[in-house]
Amino acid sequence: MTTQSSAGPQSQPSRDFFASSPSATPGSPSKQASQASKQPDALVTPSSVTANTSVCADNLLDHHQHEPQHDAASVVIGIEGSINDSAAIHRRRQQPRRAAVQNAKPLFLAEDEDDAINWPVADQEEGDDFFSTQLADQKVKRPARATVNSDEKDFQPSTLSSLSSPPSETVYKRSPPSDDVQASNGPAKRPKKSWSTPASVATTKSAPRHCSPTPDPRLRHDAFDRRYIGTFVLSAWSLSKGSSYVKPGDAVRIFRPRKKHATAEPKIASKLTNGGMQKAKQTTLNFRGASAGPTNFFTSKQKSKEKEHFIVRFSNMRGFEVGRLPLEVAIWMSKLIDAGIAEFEGVVVDCPPSLTVGCDIILQVKAYIKFDAFFSTLLGSREFDDQNEALRPETAESDLEKTLRERKISLLRMFRVCDLKPRLSNAILKSHKASDDFSSEAMLDQYGGDIQGAVKHAGSDLAISTENGTQLPHAGEDASSTAIDLDVEGDTDAVAHLEIADQLQSAKRQTDGDADTEENDGTELNLNQLDQVYRKAQANDAHLPEVEPPESFVLTLRPYQKQALGWMKNMEMAPGQSSSSQEQSVTQQGNGDTGERNVSLHPLWEEYEFPLDYDNPQANERLILSATRLFYFNPYTGDLSLDFQRASKGSRGGILADEMGLGKTIMVASLLHANRTSDPGEESEGEINAVDAAEGDVSTKRKGSAKQTSLASAFAASTSSVDQRKALLKASVSKGKASLVVAPMSLIGQWRDELIRASAPGSLTPVLYYADTKGDLLAQLESGKVDVVITSYGTLVTEYRRFLDGGGASNRHLSVSAPLYCIDWLRVILDEAHNIKNRSTMNARACCDLVSRRRWALTGTPIINRLTDLFSLLKFLRVEPWGDFSFFNSFVCKPFQAKSTKALDVVQVILESVLLRREKKMKDKDGKPIVELPPKTIVVKELEFSELERRIYDNVYRRAYLQFASLKANGTVTRNLSVIFSVLMRLRQAVCHPSLVLKAGSKVQSGGIRKDHVDRNGEVGVGEGDHVEVDADAVEFGLDSDHVGGNGTPSTQDLRELVAQFQLDEAGEAGDDSTESYTKATVERLIGEMHGDQATVPPVVSDGENECPICLEESQISPCYLPRCMHSACKACLVDYLGQCKQKGDQGACPTCRKGPVQETDLIEAIRTRPATRAASGGASPTDRPGKACTLTSVPSVIYVRNNLRTSTKLSALISHLNTLRATEAAFKGVIFSQFTSFLDLIEPVLTRYRFHFLRLDGSTPQKVRDKLVLEFQSPSPTNHVVLFLISLKAGGVGLNLTAANKIWLLDFWWNSSIENQAIDRIHRFGQTSPVSVFRYIIKDSIEDRILLIQKRKDMLIKHALNTDNHPHGTKPNSEMLANLDLLFGE
């Protein structure tokens, strides 16, 4: 141990050699060193010698990892001495030993060549540095590592291999990097830089040619291989038996055993076969899906199921394995070794003279942290699988977050056992760690104090005792509700302890080793809880001061909108230093003195000082003379840095969450006029970070005033190089002058029109940046003529992908491919900001990576379902410290899952400072409603399936139920959610229209099923290989066009011919004169009504003519006529009457004159297109045909349609309702919403058949066409006729202004009522002057009934949300999702 500590640290591989090789040579280090002076200088590489030569070289390489060298020549000499002594080593291997020693596994076998191949790239170059004194381009490189273990993939460090420098330059000059730097996002070439260039110049001025705009950030610091962290003592246990292994004072090597790959083993020699070859046992490969049932809906689940072990072993210096470290230590130590973050050396303190298996060995362990660990952060180099991330549940822990969490826990544990305490820490961390309290209650006390009515947290204190006395919580409990007693001195982190303990339990149960395999669900909120969250934020909204807009804003604001303008102007001001509750002063620990920085430490970071290793005076000397003496650690994310982490002044901006329809666009327009430019001295993220880069180590430069910085580098998920981005933004052409508005595609045109309407001519210039309207954005901004750029989320994501695919800021053509990401925006405004609620989506990542000085999120629903919906908004706004998911998850999500009401109180405190929300029902300071809107009426109509529809639906439901039951029986429901949701979608479509469950290749015409869609067996195809068995009556869903004019509406001549063919009886003889006379008179009257020519209409024969002979009701609005006799009756009465006749086996006949036979499809329906009082006005040509652009003059006052269209129950109810309204109201405008565009396809021909004028908007509608459609719908109709707007719920359910309508039809149900409410608020909003009616259709005994039950069930959850979990420990209740599925498929 003394010999190893006599010199400073030397360059070494990024991971301990024994992590990939479980063996070591039994050569003596002292003897190897003694042979150093006997060998000449030579160049030797591990791949150029025999197996034994490689063995010896590798052993000495590993030895030199712990024993630094004085110069490069001694390294070469020592290595060659070891190589030439290979014969002696071989003879020592053959010496007889006792049985225990013979059973011991010598660590160097013939597999060493494979070990060398599997070394990481950084290990290869480190080895070459030891064996060579030549330049880097002359070295012989080993092959790249073939495979990476699953648990190491996310831990691949960005290593910097330090070349061996002359002794005189080691301390005072920075070591240049090797040719290939293994960065976190792949190999990166070393910047070409002169060896004699001073470090300071290289940091601030010199930029490498042909590479990134700025040098490697490692060059800003004095490079070192590793630094001493601390020493701790542990009790290991022996795996060997004998007396010749170790004794007190011996040094030992600590390493990770090589992992076994799941491949068939080769043939091996066996003594049982007398030296022959025995076939190895066959290994069955499990590909995690072929035999384990259906695959998961995102593939990262497979990775988490792979077996993982925490074994850490130690061997003597001769290379023989001695024992293992205890599992409590191995859990966190193995993660650090695998990730190349730390290395460990040990010395035997005490052990028995003769070892036995299982006996205790006391070790003193030294911990070293590697230089590369400070640059291997995953926050700046995230690799995402877009497809899998999109399918990932919103609250599920991603692979990156799991890796960061394990890294964080391991580092915290290492610092704790080494008794390494922070030198500087902010007030939150200091107080919380001192009291061991990282719960929501502590955060509430820190940020907002107590809140009245808070419910006392009820948590379980039961615990499980482990072998070493550690108190472990029961599975599923949170750290905030469990007392943990760990035998570690100093301050502790309860959250980290809990996760360490969970890992320990998992390892002892021999599970897959995941610390947290359960998805992070359980943060769903119901309406009452949402009201509770918003209540505190809305408490003082009525008393906000009103601020008048500038003269350039030409519209008149309402009082509540003036209050919003004043609040937004205040939020864009720089927060005061003393008044900001989120700024924490930096206090200094040690020696009892305190001090303040002009630049405050980031509230999530702590400052540490590298301790001195008193056993290594040379290393201490280098540390004292080095400028890199401090490092920084984030205990919430596990990030390490050598750069000072500065805090910002606070976020500029907030969340404008006014309810839909209150005019958020107009409020933001007034802000754009009020705050046109940035404040003097206001700096952007790029400028702030560039200043930090230029200053280098802030710990040595205390001067300078505090500058604002948002958390782009700490929170934003940027896949580009941070330094490259800083330089790029520093040269931005905008420099905080223009604002960017990001909105759904349907709204960008509306944003432009609203901004122009609200602005005086020439005062504000908005431009669209979308499709062919993009132009040269940078040139427009440079001209100074553009104030606001409006783009869509889709365009932003497209440019973000180019930004990533092009190498980020290093792309020379970034200004052409992705100009939105090379502009320093004054403000970024997200309209409908709930589009980024899922933090894993490209929408969220693209928005968060924009650089801006001010940020705004506009949404009527900042929280839709879960508390985690709020996180993405906080991250986008750079709200410290809540924009970090580890922090948010620890103090909000997990306590809420543990039934702690304090979690909601913390959310209230957060929103109080960044959110403004007003609702339509709220009142102003005088007690008057802030906005007076006309009443809104919601009518729900219950319908029943027809007999045929019921058979089709029951068949689809039966097959769906069987599929769900099969998955549930196999326990694979959660792994096949995509299948379940597909089945549920088919059920919901079957409720709307049976044709929607046809095969994708089938085409539906006129809202029906064609005959060729039914096979010989009468089966109608359904999606995904299912079939619905129906009889040939399914064909009746088609439209029989016989005797029908174009589009199913008979012309005048057609009507005469149609009636004439029914006037002949079965014998071909005409009827009596009275019947014939009545029929002719009725036909002429109907034709006259159709033209609106009342002068030619014969007088009514009798007053009782309009009376239905079945129900005896009068005033038939849309009567049906029997063509044989032209007697009339209500359509519903006739259809029911003819159906009863068919059931009895009788032929249908006229209920008045008994003339027949009559079928249901023979009926002729008379439909009025406008009220009867207006029937005389206007006229039409008999040859007019219907279409999408029908006008009043082209539509007859009465149309006649043959009842030969078999459609769905919902569509029939919709058409009947529309016909009734058209006959009673002069004119109206209505909007029809549906989630399925295929259902809209079926509605279109039916509306055309009944001569309704309609427009349509869905996701396929181009943006320019959308603007024209909305403008046409909002404009007054010159002919004052009925206009309908068909809109898909996703494409037009948000943002649109459709106040011209006053009637709404919602044809299907969504799982979340907030989406439907947003659609309703497109009509019932600011500017609406008429009462609004909402009509909903629900089918009895269908899945829609159960969807409504789920909505009601969510509302009732508040009654049980705060109750403690009564389930026995060790079991889990069904999740909310599974409970809902059980409800949907229940009996």
Swiss-Prot record:
Subcellular location: Cytoplasm; Nucleus
This enzyme's EC code(s): 3.6.4.-
Biased composition annotated in UniProt, kind: Low complexity: 19-40, 157-168, 577-589
Positions with a binding annotation for ATP: 658-665
Composition-biased stretches (Acidic residues): 513-522
Stretch list, region Disordered: 1-49, 132-219, 503-528, 573-598, 676-704
UniProt-listed Pfam families: Helicase_C, HIRAN, SNF2-rel_dom
Keyword DNA-binding (UniProt): yes
GO cellular component: cytoplasm; nucleus
UniProt KW Nucleotide-binding keyword: yes
Ranges spanned by the short sequence motif DEAH box, renumbered to the chain: 831-834
Protein's GO biological process: DNA repair
Gene3D superfamilies: P-loop containing nucleotide triphosphate hydrolases, Tandem AAA-ATPase domain, Zinc/RING finger domain, C3HC4 (zinc finger)
Domain Helicase ATP-binding: 645-880
InterPro entries tied to this protein: Helicase_ATP-bd, Helicase_C-like, HIRAN, P-loop_NTPase, SNF2-like_sf, SNF2/RAD54-like_C, SNF2_N, SNF2_RAD54_helicase_TF
Family: Belongs to the SNF2/RAD54 helicase family.
Primary role: Probable helicase, member of the UBC2/RAD6 epistasis group. Functions with DNA repair protein RAD18 in error-free postreplication DNA repair. Involved in the maintenance of wild-type rates of instability of simple repetitive sequences such as poly(GT) repeats. Seems to be involved in maintaining a balance which acts in favor of error-prone non-homologous joining during DNA double-strand breaks repairs.
Name the record gives this protein: DNA repair protein RAD5
Native organism: Mycosarcoma maydis
Upper lineage: Eukaryota, Fungi, Dikarya, Basidiomycota, Ustilaginomycotina
Gene that encodes the chain: RAD5
